Amino acid sequence: MFFPNPEERPYKLPALCEEVNISIHEIELDCVYCERQLYRCEVYDFIFRDLCVVYRKGKPLGVCQPCLLFYSKVRQYRRYNQSVYGRTLENLTNKQLCNILIRCGKCQKPLCPLEKQRHVDENKRFHQIADQWTGRCTQCWRPSATVV
């Protein structure tokens, strides 16, 4: 697979599979960071998290789980802007939470409306990192420690 023309490159994995006529279950991608071939479960996670395919020298690349977690943390430390509560975020953007793209700060999955509502209900903040809003998905959510 080689795409020299940027205008012809599919940036979502299902579109790439369709373009090259390969099943999602058969496509092979390398990691953009460590260059290791993605495991099948990482390919499925890539689709589930609605991540974009990147290209280096015309070759499509994804991201493996360890690199995704590592570089998400690096991005959090280097590109942090601010933290706000749900109501404040709605006021800042003039949009309802359900209409704002908020990704999990750890795994990068887009948050569903219930996950966004959980932040509001539990009085947790959303974080602006590299001008994108993040929170925590259900899978990555860690409840705060309670003293018994």
Curated annotation (Swiss-Prot):
GO biological process annotation, one example: symbiont-mediated suppression of host type I interferon-mediated signaling pathway
Record-level Gene Ontology MF annotations: DNA binding; PDZ domain binding; zinc ion binding
User: Where does this chain carry the motif PDZ-binding domain?
Assistant: 146-148
GO cellular component, alphabetical, reads:
host cell cytoplasm; host cell nucleus
Q: Which domain of life is it from?
A: Viruses
Which InterPro entries does this UniProt record tie to the protein?
A: E6, E6_sf
- Any other comment in the entry? Belongs to the high risk human alphapapillomavirus family. The cancer-causing human papillomavirus E6 protein has a unique carboxy terminal PDZ domain containing substrate.
Q: Does the keyword DNA-binding apply?
A: yes
What function does this protein fulfil? Plays a major role in the induction and maintenance of cellular transformation. Acts mainly as an oncoprotein by stimulating the destruction of many host cell key regulatory proteins. E6 associates with host UBE3A/E6-AP ubiquitin-protein ligase, and inactivates tumor suppressors TP53 and TP73 by targeting them to the 26S proteasome for degradation. In turn, DNA damage and chromosomal instabilities increase and lead to cell proliferation and cancer development.
> Which compartment or compartments is the protein found in?
Host cytoplasm; Host nucleus
Signal sequence extent: none
Q: Which UniProt keywords apply?
A: Activator, DNA-binding, Early protein, Host cytoplasm, Host nucleus, Host-virus interaction, Inhibition of host innate immune response by virus, Inhibition of host IRF3 by virus, Inhibition of host RLR pathway by virus, Metal-binding, Modulation of host cell apoptosis by virus, Oncogene, Transcription, Transcription regulation, Viral immunoevasion, Zinc, Zinc-finger
Q: What is this protein called?
A: Protein E6
Name the Pfam families on file. E6 (PF00518)
- Which residue spans match zinc fingers labelled unnamed? 31-67, 104-140
Record family assignment: Belongs to the papillomaviridae E6 protein family.
